[in-house]
Curated annotation (Swiss-Prot):
Binds 1 Mg(2+) ion per subunit. Pathway: Cofactor biosynthesis; FMN biosynthesis; FMN from riboflavin (CTP route): step 1/1. CDP binds at residues 196-201, 300-303. It comes from Haloarcula marismortui (strain ATCC 43049 / DSM 3752 / JCM 8966 / VKM B-1809). The lineage of its organism: Archaea, Methanobacteriati, Methanobacteriota, Stenosarchaea group, Halobacteria. Catalyzes the CTP-dependent phosphorylation of riboflavin (vitamin B2) to form flavin mononucleotide (FMN). Mg(2+) binds at residues 225, 227. Residues 1-10 have a biased composition (Basic residues). FMN binds at residues 287, 295. Belongs to the archaeal riboflavin kinase family. This is Riboflavin kinase. Residues 187-320 are annotated as: Riboflavin kinase. Residues 11-23 have a biased composition (Low complexity).
Amino acid sequence: MRTRGSRNWRSRASSGSGTRSWSIEATDRNLSQQCDVAEHVRQRVKLYPAQTVKRAFRTNPVSVSLRSKSGMHSTFGMLIRRESLLQRMAESTGQGVGRDELATLKLLALDGALDESTKVSCADLAERLDASNQTASRRLQRLEDAGLLARDIVSDGQEVELTGDGERRLQSEYADYRRIFESDASVDLTGVVTSGMGEGRHYITLPGYMEQFIERLGYEPFAGTLNLELTAESVRKRARMSAIEPVTIEGWEDDERTYGPAYCYPASIEGSDSEYEPAHVIAPERTHHGEEQLEVIAPEKLREVLELADGDEVIVHVSE
């Protein structure tokens, strides 16, 4: 039973041995949201002996008291951040997305769910995953809760399709494997030239950034960026850039504000008639641009050197 306002929870449960009964009181003075800690403890005690429960909560921000019928009790004070408890509770209630869920996502993509809605049944999926129907169903639910999968329950199964986030998650996994098996990771991105808002000119010329550009990139960039709108295919491929080691431009601050870091990926720019390098794809940590927007810096004004106008298509070769 939960007492409103006090954030104290009580529950009764078997210790797991069948011979002892425990009264459980869990007090949490730090959580900013209502988490049913007692239920979490109760489930743990039902499955495991008391010492196992004690170990399970050793890194949680709660005070848990297990009291036997004879009146003997022990209390453990937990002082770690609340995120630890939230993470454990999420794992125990099936909210996390781990390697098993990613394996399921990959299997669905291989079935065609990357490009269109695909019908699946939990029984068939469970057999292919070597898991129970309940486990397969839980994995689908976790993927949906995480925004990686869209589901529609129909009379004879489920229609599933990877979301944009789901596709990017697999692209990121793919990029990791490329780093393992390929010595020189690379990705080609296609986009059309667009006009920016002029923000690139302002930020590039700030001393805190410009000094690092010169030192770490080996050139003084032109005061402005080449803005590109990527094709749908290149938006999907963009996650592969995580396999490439960027040049980090550190964040800094002045008397008025702080400025976030940026990451520069070595690149060359291919226009209709010529190719230009050196250049860098710049990815500020703080940006209002979406995944479809790409910014490129170079020592010269790329529009003039490559004779580009809005709407022209270019290919950005990003590599280490």
